Swiss-Prot record:
Pfam families referenced in this protein's UniProt entry, alphabetically: F-box (PF00646), Kelch_1 (PF01344)
Organism: Arabidopsis thaliana
The keyword Repeat is annotated on this UniProt entry: yes
Domain F-box: 41-90
The keyword Transferase is assigned to this record: no
Keywords: Kelch repeat, Repeat
InterPro entries referenced in this protein's UniProt entry, alphabetically: F-box-like_dom_sf (IPR036047), F-box_dom (IPR001810), Kelch-typ_b-propeller (IPR015915), Kelch_1 (IPR006652)
Residue ranges of coiled coil: none
PROSITE patterns from the UniProt entry: FBOX
Domain of life: Eukaryota
Repeat (Kelch) residue spans along the chain: 96-141, 152-191, 192-238, 240-295, 367-413
Record-given protein name: F-box/kelch-repeat protein At5g26960
SMART domains: FBOX, Kelch
Amino acid sequence: MSENCNSRHFSWLMKSCLPNPSDAKSLVQIHQPSSTAANSSATIASLPDDLLLECISRVPSSSIPSLAVVCRRWSRLLHSPYFLHLRRRLGLLRHSLFAISTVDSGLFAADLQFQSEIASWKVSLAVSSRSVGVDGSYGSLSHARAAAIGPRVYVVSRNAVLRYDSWMGTLNLRSPMIFPRKKFAIAVVSGKIYVAGGGGGSEVAAAVEEYDPELNRWEVVTQSARKRYGCIGAAVDGVFYVIGGLKIGNETSRAVAARAYASSMDLFDVESRQWLRSRSVPGGGCVVAACAAVGYVYVLTSHAVELSFWRFDARRRGGNSGFGEWQRLKSPPLPAQVRLDGTVRFSCVGVEDKVAVVQVVGCIDDLLRRSGRGERGIRESLVLLYDTTEGEWRRAADLPEMITRAACACVEW
C-alpha cells in the first residue's frame, strides 16, 4: 500500500463528491487561480486531513473497506476517532447487538440489528483459532469480556486481547492486561476501556486498569477499596460502575460481606480519579447482569424465589436532580419462581433505547427440571429485549447455534 494516493485510486470518489458538469444548477461560480495546471485528482490528493475526512466520512458503510486499501494515509484517517465522530454527527451510524464466542475449532461472531422489522442474527465472523493466534502462547479467550468503541470490539480475556473491526472485518491481537484476571468488570468511558476486580489474587482485584486504544497500552489508574470477583461493569456520564460479585481476601465475616457485595456497586469518576459513594440495589439479592442505556444503569438481580429488574438514575449532567434514585421495573418474562444457581448466566447490553438480556450459558428447562417443575420451551441462547420507552419486554431471535458462552457488546458502525 502506498503512502500517498493517485488518480486511479480515488477516481470513483470524485464522481460522488464533485458536481455534475452537465448540470448548470449544480455549478457555482468561484474564483479561479491564475495557474490551474494541476488536474482535479491532484487537488483531491492535496486536501488537508480535515477536508479529506469530510469527504470520505459520507460514503456508505459497505465502501469503507475499499477506502482503507487506497493508501496508508486514508487507512490512518479511517482509524482516527474524528472519522467516527463525523459519521456520528452525520447520522450514518447504526447500533447492533454483537456476540462473539470461542470454541475449540475457532471464533464465531454474529450481530443483531433492531432497525429492521424482522430482526435476525447475521454471522459476521467464522475463523480458525490458529489463524488469529489465540491458541498456545496467547492464552485462551474463554470466559472473555467484550467492550466496543465505535465499530471495534475488544475481546478481553485473562491472557489475551483481540480486536475485531466490524467495518473492515479484520482481527488483530492487542496488548494484554497488566494483571491477568478473570470474571472482572469492564466498561468504556470516553474512548478508553476500564477493568476492575476479578480473580487472580488480592493485588489483581484491587487494581483498576485503563486501556488506551490509540497507544495500545494498559496502565493502572487507581486501587479499588473493595476487591470483587465475578463483578460486572457499566459506564454513564464519565463514571465507571463496578457492580455485584463476591468479596475476596482474608477479611473476617466473609460470608456476610459477600452478600453485601453481591447487591452493591462502586462508582469511579474517571476524570477526577475519585471513588464516589457506593450504592446498593433495594431489596438485596445477587446481581446477575447489568448494563447502561439512555443515562441509566439497568440491573437484573436474583433472589431466593424470583428475579427482579431495576434501573439506577446515573445522569449527573444537565442539572439532573434524580441522580442516585432506584426504580423497580417490570421483570423479564421468565418462568415464575426461577432462582439462578450459576448454571444459567445472562449478559445485559444496552442498545440505543433498549436493553438486551442474553442467555449466554445454561438451559432454563434443565434448571426447572432440577427444581421439580415440568415447564418446557425455554432452553438456551434466549434473547429478551426491554423497551425503555414503553416499559415492555419482547422476545428477539435466539442466538445462533454456534455462538456459545458468548461475550456481548453494543457495536456502533
